[in-house]
């Protein structure tokens, strides 16, 4: 764990000494929250999704986020263009599998992207990761089914071996898997009562990957989000909780992350 903490400290420092351009191809439901999250940790969001401009924007970016929520034909065209440009220019890509467990269109798009391109990080909740692993739909909605952690770890390991991507599975325990596996147990149940918080995690991962294309960068991004929400007063309502989360994201110090992180490395 000492190596994890040391590397996360370096990534945190690099992140806060940078102002990288993060190209987010996302949905109308989460776009504002994601842009604010990127800004809150000192990076610059660019939310372009017009197929006529995305190649130029991606080419200038330091990281690309592809979010499959509320997908449209228009954005599918943009996604395919941006992913190609990112690969050609060694720009890290975070692919957030929003809704792939409920939509054949999204699952087929994901499989097509993974067949033809290299993805730095594949992120989804337990159900979405399981659906990608079995290549089939598994639920009527976008929230996780009650899957066992060990089952999801097995899915993550197999997906990492197949696609050589960092795999992030979010749930009660967050799983981050590459050549090593970390279980993260920070967080707050209130996150599940606010829309787009999972999408925000994806945008934070895109930010940390812009300075380090590593599993530790993903652990840092998730921990920043989860520890920030833990620091919000337990007595406040959901609107105040959301505001407090963004306040904490913008002010969280490395020492707070180091002191509060609940991470466990498991045998891979």
From Swiss-Prot:
InterPro entries: Hyethyz_kinase (IPR000417), Ribokinase-like (IPR029056)
Sites where the protein binds substrate: 47, 196
Record's keyword terms, sorted: ATP-binding, Kinase, Magnesium, Metal-binding, Nucleotide-binding, Thiamine biosynthesis, Transferase
Catalytic activity: 5-(2-hydroxyethyl)-4-methylthiazole + ATP = 4-methyl-5-(2-phosphooxyethyl)-thiazole + ADP + H(+)
Family under the similarity heading: Belongs to the Thz kinase family.
Encoding gene per record: thiM
Listed EC numbers: 2.7.1.50
Nuclease as UniProt keyword: no
Domain of life, per lineage: Bacteria
Cofactor(s) for this UniProt protein: Mg(2+)
Protein name: Hydroxyethylthiazole kinase
Annotated pathway: Cofactor biosynthesis; thiamine diphosphate biosynthesis; 4-methyl-5-(2-phosphoethyl)-thiazole from 5-(2-hydroxyethyl)-4-methylthiazole: step 1/1
Function of the molecule: Catalyzes the phosphorylation of the hydroxyl group of 4-methyl-5-beta-hydroxyethylthiazole (THZ).
HAMAP family, alphabetized: Thz_kinase
Species, as recorded: Finegoldia magna (strain ATCC 29328 / DSM 20472 / WAL 2508)
GO molecular function terms attached to this record: ATP binding; hydroxyethylthiazole kinase activity; magnesium ion binding
Gene Ontology terms describing biological process: thiamine biosynthetic process; thiamine diphosphate biosynthetic process
